[in-house]
Swiss-Prot record:
Domain Helicase ATP-binding positions: 26-414
UniProt short sequence motif Beta-hairpin, positions renumbered to this chain: 92-115
Family per record: Belongs to the UvrB family.
Residues that coordinate or bind ATP: 39-46
Listed name of the protein: UvrABC system protein B
Job of this protein: The UvrABC repair system catalyzes the recognition and processing of DNA lesions. A damage recognition complex composed of 2 UvrA and 2 UvrB subunits scans DNA for abnormalities. Upon binding of the UvrA(2)B(2) complex to a putative damaged site, the DNA wraps around one UvrB monomer. DNA wrap is dependent on ATP binding by UvrB and probably causes local melting of the DNA helix, facilitating insertion of UvrB beta-hairpin between the DNA strands. Then UvrB probes one DNA strand for the presence of a lesion.
Length: 673
């Protein structure tokens, strides 16, 4: 089923790309475990990585810091490799509230989650591709370090069907039930099967547009065919087919029985400890909850919160790392960590937060101590599991630089010829008046300005001052949610206002070609917001404009300022030299404003598979407070459908906005009832 990676692009590597590709490939072939690609904004880092994958023909996992950037990368990789398996693996929860206990108020919060069926299917498709093929690129979020079903058990549970094999119909149905497929003769959907005489139709859990028809003659498989579940039209007949489990967490019956005995042993030991410490309530609570889970596992093969018993189900010892997506990646696989200066610290922080919450649950008798082993990987475990790694960032962190021995692959030259901004340092005493005159110059020629301050109070005062002097200005602060933030950025690009003031405007993916000036107030105050890395990221916001300029207001040049200015000058000189040698005139970017709000659109298109155009999704209206319970319930169902539609298109911000509205509506419904 595997094909060689075939790169599809109208462009050939140019600028620094050929040298970067050569050095990365040489490093990988020489066995280097860690390499860092320092690629500035707009230099084509994704294209470079795609070339490395295509040249070396190795299965690859790309880690992104969040779902939105993962969606962007998935869309780009899908365009580069249309004939290969490009997969998407992020958390399948549209909404997730983990179970927790607050001792101070004696409040237990039940686990509550809304699973996105479409993303669950994409996750299953990703692991299937990793097990079956070598031409696979999986774009994943930090969800990749969380526990997943054991690949060995997952492989054991698969159902292999071959034309001519002898198998009883009941045996097939029994195996499908073990794989957690449900029989549904009416509504045929993903993860179900239907039976009509000697014909069994199965809708694979990892597929969104193809189902399998198994035709039996007595106890022999006579024919296997793939068909469109919507139209019923046969697509092709095949000699064999493998049906994967409906979920990553299925376990063979004998393993469940063994796990139940081990759970009973741990329960007995834990009860003894609690009683010795005179914790009678906790002992009773733990016994009741665990016995209920054991009964469910005995009858159904699973229970709510079965992941808390994952240590027993996968046969691991106490403290051993859980199986994750890394266990599905072949030994010669390649790991690419995008925006590594953000992603690496994220990976390091996941374990501690999860541990703190679960320790409280164990202490107060809500869970057995083994629940602590249902966790994300520790950072040292991630390091041990990670294959050869390429870190990609415009501002690599100390960790990446240390791991790659300070030997960084530079990709500074942009094929468009755009130069890094000119940097000026000006005194603090006159910074506000000087900034006002600069803003007026930019506004007169229809260009935009970003201003970063150190404190919320200063940002508010500056915004007020600029408004009083007739400037069109907005203020971006931490209370603004993701969707509104994107709308403010869109309005800035459209020219609804000219100046955006904020405290931390260096978020990755902030892509605004219209911004020609970045002003950094109090640049000489050393700290997190004025570190070398933060300054380079902020200065880079003006790097997509031909007239890009950055003004740093400070009475002295700090070490961080000196390094940031030096690095920007180095990049600028290198680009200028390249432009002169190749006769390139810098070209401004004319990126459509709609792009920034439609990051999930590519994925929705790739998944549509020619089934007609997607309907425009209408935003929900404001809900009157005096609606009847019946009308409220109708509105709740309507918004749930809308939320799922947004989530299916990977428009997570819109889905989250509707989810928050649903919470309010449900509270109103309870009060009205």
């Amino acid at each position: 089923m595997s094909k060689p990676f075939k790169l599809n692009s109208a462009f050939k590597p140019s600028g620094d790309q050929p040298e970067a590709i050569r050095r990365l490939e040489e490093g990988l072939e020489d066995g280097l475990a860690h390499q860092t690609l320092l690629g500035v904004t707009g230099s084509g880092k994704t294209f470079t990585i795609a070339n490395v994958i295509a040249d070396l023909q190795r299965p690859t996992m790309v880690l992104a810091p969040n779902k939105t950037l993962a969606a962007q990368l998935y869309g780009e990789m899908k365009e580069f490799f249309p004939e290969n398996a490009v997969e998407y693996f992020v958390s399948y929860y549209d909404y997730y509230q983990p179970e927790a206990y607050v001792p101070s108020s004696d409040t237990f919060i039940e686990k509550d989650a809304s699973v996105n069926e479409h993303i669950e299917q994409m996750r299953l498709s990703a692991t299937k591709a990793m097990l079956e093929r070598r031409d696979v690129v999986v774009v994943a979020s930090v969800s990749a370090i969380y526990g997943l079903g054991d690949p060995d058990l997952y492989l054991k549970m698969m159902l292999h069907l071959t034309v001519g094999m002898i198998i009883d119909q009941r045996a097939i149905l029994r195996r499908l039930a073990e794989l957690q497929y449900a029989r549904n003769d009416q509504a045929f959907q993903r993860g179900t099967f239907r039976v009509r005489g000697e014909v069994i139709d199965i809708f694979p859990a990892e597929s969104d547009d193809i189902a399998l028809r198994v035709e039996l003659f007595d106890e022999e498989v006579e024919r296997l065919s793939l068909f469109d579940p919507l139209t019923g039209q046969i697509v092709s007949t095949i000699p064999r087919f493998t049906i994967y489990p409906k979920t990553h967490y299925v376990t063979p019956r004998e393993r469940i029985v063994q796990a139940m005995e081990e759970i009973k042993e741990e329960l007995a030991a834990r009860r003894k400890v609690l009683l010795e410490n005179n914790k009678l309530l906790e002992e009773q609570r733990l016994t009741q909850r665990t016995q209920f889970d054991l009964e469910m596992m005995n009858e159904l093969g699973y229970c709510s919160g079965i992941e808390n018993y994952s240590r027993f189900l996968s046969g691991r010892g106490p403290g051993e790392p859980p199986p994750t997506l890394f266990d599905y990646l072949p030994a010669d696989g390649l790991l690419v960590v995008d925006e590594s200066h953000v992603t690496i610290p994220q990976i390091g922080g996941m374990y501690r937060g999860d541990r703190a919450r679960k320790e409280t649950l164990v202490e107060y008798g809500f869970r057995l101590p083994s629940a602590l082993d249902n966790r994300p990987l520790k950072f040292e475990e991630f390091e041990a599991l990670a294959p050869q790694t390429i870190y990609v960032s415009a501002t690599p962190g100390n960790y990446e630089l240390e791991k790659s021995g300070g030997d960084v692959v530079d990709q500074v030259v942009r094929p468009t010829g755009l130069l890094d901004p000119i940097i000026e340092v000006r005194p603090v005493a006159t910074q506000v008046d000087d900034l006002l005159s600069e803003i007026r110059q930019r506004a007169a020629i229809n260009e935009r300005v970003l201003v970063t301050t150190l404190t919320k109070r200063m940002a508010e005062d500056l915004t007020e001052y600029l408004e009083e002097h007739g400037e069109r200005v907005r203020y971006l602060h931490s209370d603004i949610d993701t969707v509104e933030r994107m709308e403010i950025i869109r309005d800035l690009r459209l020219g609804e206002f000219d100046v955006l003031v904020g405290i931390n405007l260096l978020r990755e993916g902030l892509d605004m070609p219209e911004v020609s000036l970045v002003a950094i107030l109090d640049a000489d105050k050393e700290g997190f917001l004025r570190s070398e890395r933060s300054l380079i990221q902020t200065i880079g916001r003006a790097a997509r404009n031909v007239n890009g300029k950055a003004i740093l207001y400070g009475d002295k040049i700090t070490p961080s300022m000196a390094k940031a200015i030096g690095e920007t000058e180095r990049r600028r000189e290198k680009q200028q030299k390249y432009n002169e040698e190749h006769g390139i005139t810098p070209q401004g970017l004319n990126k459509k404003v709609v792009d920034i709000l439609a990051l999930g659109q590519n994925i929705a298109k790739t998944k549509a598979k020619g089934r007609g155009k997607s309907r425009p999704i209408v935003e929900p209206d404001n809900v009157p407070m005096d609606m009847s319970p019946k009308a409220l319930l109708q509105k709740i169902h309507e918004l749930e459908g809308l939320m799922m539609q947004h989530a299916q298109n990977l428009e997570f911000e819109e889905a989250a906005q509707i989810r928050d509205q649903l919470h309010q509506l449900r509270e109103l419904f309870i009060a009205a009832s």
